[in-house]
Amino acid sequence: MSSAPRRPASGADSLHTPEPESLSPGTPGFPEQEEEDELRTLGVERFEEILQEAGSRGGEEPGRSYGEEDFEYHRQSSHHIHHPLSTHLPPDARRRKTPQGPGRKPRRRPGASPTGETPTIEEGEEDEDEVGEAEGFRAPPQQPSPASSPSAVQFFLQEDEGTDRKAERTSPSPPTQTPHQEAAPRASKGAQTGTLVEEMVAVASGTAGGDDGGAAGRPLTKAQPGHRSYNLQERRRIGSMTGVEQALLPRVPTDESEAQTLATADLDLMKSHRFEDVPGVRRHLVRKNAKGSTQAAREGREPGPTPRARPRAPHKPHEVFVELNELQLDKNQEPQWRETARWIKFEEDVEEETERWGKPHVASLSFRSLLELRRTLAHGAVLLDLDQQTLPGVAHQVVEQMVISDQIKAEDRANVLRALLLKHSHPSDEKEFSFPRNISAGSLGSLLGHHHAQGTESDPHVTEPLIGGVPETRLEVDRERELPPPAPPAGITRSKSKHELKLLEKIPENAEATVVLVGCVEFLSRPTMAFVRLREAVELDAVLEVPVPVRFLFLLLGPSSANMDYHEIGRSISTLMSDKQFHEAAYLADERDDLLTAINAFLDCSVVLPPSEVQGEELLRSVAHFQRQMLKKREEQGRLLPPGAGLEPKSAQDKALLQMVEVAGAAEDDPLRRTGRPFGGLIRDVRRRYPHYLSDFRDALDPQCLAAVIFIYFAALSPAITFGGLLGEKTQDLIGVSELIMSTALQGVIFCLLGAQPLLVIGFSGPLLVFEEAFFSFCKSNQLEYLVGRVWIGFWLVLLALLMVALEGSFLVRFVSRFTQEIFAFLISLIFIYETFYKLIKIFQEHPLHGCSVSNDSEADSSSNNMTWAATTLAPDNSSASGQERPRGQPNTALLSLVLMAGTFFIAFFLRKFKNSRFFPGRIRRVIGDFGVPIAILIMVLVDYSIEDTYTQKLSVPSGFSVTAPDKRGWVINPLGEKTPFPVWMMVASLLPAVLVFILIFMETQITTLIISKKERMLQKGSGFHLDLLLIVAMGGICALFGLPWLAAATVRSVTHANALTVMSKAVAPGDKPKIQEVKEQRVTGLLVALLVGLSMVIGDLLRQIPLAVLFGIFLYMGVTSLNGIQFYERLHLLLMPPKHHPDVTYVKKVRTMRMHLFTALQLLCLALLWAVMSTAASLAFPFILILTVPLRMVVLTRIFTEREMKCLDANEAEPVFDECEGVDEYNEMPMPV
């Protein structure tokens, strides 16, 4: 026999009787890595494969040389008095052992390096040890002793082994032949344990839980193996957890067979090495070893992950919902987790007195709490990608990690676990009268008690009463893989409450929750913390206020004596998790340092306020500005991240290429880009928009479109009636309500069927009304036929439109800046306001006020006047009909007209303000505000109808589809003249007014299209500037043949139409602005609105009841509301305001006050010039004067003001308005006339 000693390879080897010290040369060598991957998931099925293989493996390598390390290891392992591990185990915790097979190939230990430094454990070498230990189970066993009893020693299992191990216990094992094993004498020290070895082998013949375990003929080869496959993480246990007297399931540092050959000191050393985790003293580093893959390639196998390897957890960041729970006492003085705050984007706190949610606000944190949080994260437990599916499983792992990291004592494990599993309550629970949402830990345990794997009895659960003074009680948490989730009994399910549904609407669909648990407990001597990121987000029952899957958990417990504010630290981590950059870093973190780096980045962009008393909110204005600068700096730093963190190009070549691609994409999407070919822009519009033609009708199948039809109908009908009545007054009923309604209907239908942007609403506007009045005055003063002149203007309009579209002249709209738009809008608003009071003064002149008199003559005159009024009001046609003189000098007419005008204005204006108020729910406010003008008209008509003895002038509307004045005109206008031949020179000279009309239509239509097509509105189907302009102008030219008015894109009505079809996202965090989800870009709503406006001719009897004074009130309303959003109007206010009261806006902060006032004075001068032109006989040329402001701004103003000042004073800062801000609506979005 060879004298070379041999160290025991595994516990399976040492369970045998002494064997020969030398092996035959013919024994095949042990392949080191052949079964490495499979043995990582070593289970019952795998053992059956191994045990059924023929032949034995092992043997020493030929020529194996032994060094001093091997001799020292042999001396330490076999030349001492050893006590079998079974002496430390309770009688009921024994289990059958597996005999030893032939020796395996000796291998050099990865011992200390020659330099004396701590060696590094190679994972491949760890795996080879495990493979070698498993090979020992293939040895021929010894016959068992029938006198032994079955044992129940269990070992720590991986989660995947639980099911396999249970299946082994419940299935019988087929018998196999027991080959003969040769025995050999051993050394004297080894002989002392011979009896114990035989006893252990005899004990190993039993089965775990079977009655026939002691049968003499029971083969040993099917015994439950004592070996298990483990990973390095499962060694992380302290030595106190391995004491058999303190654990229900004994924990041993190694296999029993190997343990019996080791002394007590060796076992203690092994326990300390494998289980304890002493802070500051770490064991060998574990690094990846490529030996396994190279060995697999050498043997012809495909290298790949082992079956035990799990895929990397998905780290894609999601939206976040954070809930802060604090440990508090309920009304029964029982501890519970009480929700005190939540974060969707901003912080919402629960008011203590009223138990309701406060207003969302930006969280303000103390600097010390952030530093304390960073310190606790640096020293606390951090568990990333924890693979648990239930709260008890998570709590168990957290508590074990706290014990391992020496944050809590072992005896505090039960108390901390009990605290983690306390009941969770929320402010909304008390408002619900259905089944309680929270299930206590005890009731949950009673529900789960009927679903144990054994079916009869179960191990202790965390839900059973925990006695803090009994440290030997082991707490078992059922793993989800071992137990199916218990089905809830009938009656425990409930529907979501209104509060939950409302809150879920504000949370994004893919959001994942963060649960923050903080509180004071007196059984701890120092604070303990744990930060957990689950491998997959799971819904934890009765934890959150709403059913949102949980991905992160943060726990902070400690005594009240600690110098630490747990509430503020909880708010700090909650605010950090609600921060976009930090929670993205938390998703992508691989270790603790990544979290600490993210906290430092958060601190770099935080604002610290000095501890000084703030007397007013205006002192904090600079904070918001400073914060915006910090955020801008943070975004710029984010662009400089290394590759992989973003897609930002780094090289100059990549940046240039990206810039070229962006420019090319922007140019391709720009509808105003010139192609250089005749009608090139028109062709591009058709190719861009018409492919979506069928979808324009399919997208209208939505209830929101039906609501928009009703709303836009009244929004379009009210201006048609108002402008129609005023146009009839200006043109002596040559063009009135009926013509305007018919023109709106016909042109609206055609445009919705053929237009490129069907969201535009075609209608009459104030600038066109001003031009119609000026042209009518011009024709009347020159004895020309007004309607015939309009026909020739229409002819020239068509030619001008064709020429403009052929030359792709729509790009000229870019040169119409805010400077010109505001002058134009301000002029039209002044005209509206002026005309309103001018008409009212005229009524007072026609119907003067009378003093009180008691004379009979006065009474007689009054009676005659009343009789005259009565005959007038009772006549079939109203007083304004053609062929009748309006009555004059009627009593109380002027006062009633004033009341009707003022009442209409104030009701419409108040309802507009009411839309953005805080009364009633938002939906009701929006309905009332959107229908403010029709409601005001209806109320004032009822007031006028109820006053029967006072005359008021009514709207002139014919019966049926007839022109307003049938005795003056018909439906078709003769271009050569109706009553007298039209002069030829005027046919040619009509080109000049045609140019002026074209300027007005061009500006209104193209600027409105620009506003609708802003990128903030997220339109997908595109617009068509050239096609829309050609359609609108061509339809106006054709309609002039029928005596119908010209129309243009109405700015306010178009923006209102687009807003009505905009779908806002419901998942809006409290305090955040809503975002556009989609826009229903379709043609049906505009088509139906146009048809309904045309059918409004059938309600002529109702329209004839509308007093003109009511229309004057609407006129005043449009003039006043049009001033909102005009920066010129706001800067006029600043002329009378001290600089210290100026608002905090760009053109005030970036431009000196005198320079700003100079710019305002220049705009005021241009406005005065336009007003002077309007007041003279040359009023027809006001569009030409208006267009001259464009070169004035481009040539003159650029010489007076710097480029920076012009950008501040003439920038278009208006953004689409979708949310409900007080005093803000569609009128604030555009500096264009109504």
Curated annotation (Swiss-Prot):
Annotated lipid attachment (S-palmitoyl cysteine): C1166
Alphabetical keyword list: Anion exchange, Antiport, Cell membrane, Glycoprotein, Ion transport, Lipoprotein, Membrane, Methylation, Palmitate, Phosphoprotein, Transmembrane, Transmembrane helix, Transport
Positions of post-translational Phosphothreonine modification: T254
Known catalytic reactions: hydrogencarbonate(in) + chloride(out) = hydrogencarbonate(out) + chloride(in)
Amino acid composition bias (Gly residues), ranges on this chain: 207-216
UniProt-annotated location(s): Apical cell membrane; Basolateral cell membrane
Glycosylation sites: N856, N866, N878
UniProt biased composition (Basic and acidic residues): 39-49, 58-75
Membrane-side (Cytoplasmic) residue stretches: 1-704, 912-926
InterPro entries: Anion_exchange, Anion_exchange_2, Anion_exchange_CS, Band3_cytoplasmic_dom, HCO3_transpt-like_TM_dom, HCO3_transpt_euk, PTrfase/Anion_transptr
Protein's GO biological process: amelogenesis; bicarbonate transport; chloride transport; digestive tract development; negative regulation of CD8-positive, alpha-beta T cell differentiation; negative regulation of CD8-positive, alpha-beta T cell proliferation; osteoclast differentiation; positive regulation of enamel mineralization
Modified residues (Phosphoserine): S113, S145, S171, S173, S240, S440
Protein name according to UniProt: Anion exchange protein 2
Gene label: Slc4a2
